[in-house]
Amino acid sequence: MSASRFLVTGASGQLGRLVIDGLLKIVPASQIGVLVRGDKAAAEFAARGLHVHKGDYGRPETLTAAFAGVDRALLISSSEIGQRAVQHRNAIEAAKQAGVKLLAYTSLLHADTSPLGLADEHRQTEAALKASGVPYALLRNGWYTENYAASIPAALAHGVMLGSAGDGRIASAARADYADAAAKVLTADTQQAGRTYELAGDAPYTLAEFAAELSRQSGKTVAYQNLPEADYKAALVGAGLPEPFAALLADSDAGAAKGALDDASGELGHLISRPTTPLAAPIAAALASSR
């Protein structure tokens, strides 16, 4: 492809680092810029030959400098829930001023119709993108399998995996799958502006099936216990999670019970030209890291 200049915002996060790894397989480091907040991440990326910009979504002046001269950018959604819509608008405005030719945004699976509370700020951001006039692509990412894998140590300790997803099927995928998709969209020779991708795993599962796979791999019996949303939230708070985060997780599980995290389009596997990472792999990785 031609020597486009790329920018990845939020590059020091778990998804961002994987996107950079994917881009480096396709284009040279000299064409890639990153937006990071910390000195350590800035030094790490500079050592890899990338163009480093320090700043964040809450400081528009830093965004203007980062987007200058960029052809294609990935706006990774902020982790600051409740402030994301404003922060994302700052980034969109900077991209508009810079004349960015494609701004890809990591949204949420079926964001326009999703019952998840998490979808609200994604809908606001999508609306801002559409109103901005900036050519955009929506990467509506489903759930990360790693989100559930993070609960494995507690599940093994207590012999039970709690949730409120009922029999809802969850078409999650590994972060690396979504990262590869983002890298493919950013570097595609085909027209991407105006595209909306509903991205999810190939093999949906229930949390009971997750618990069964965990039991199989660990050799310990782990049962799935379904709770009402309020009780699950209370259990998470009791385990030490901040109340807002506990509420978000419980709401997401309740949404999963309604089908909000399921999808059968196969778009993610098609986009990355391979099957998405099977459920067994992140569970195995989590077990290996806990030993």
Descriptions of predicted regions:
Residues 2-41, 58-61, 66-68, 79-89, ...:
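Oxidoreductase cofactor-interface core, primarily capturing Rossmann-like NAD(P)-dependent enzymes
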Residues 230-291:
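A hydrophobic C-terminal alpha-helical subdomain
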Residues 45-58:
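Rossmann-fold cofactor-recognition segment
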Residues 40-47, 288:
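Polar/charged alpha-helical tracts
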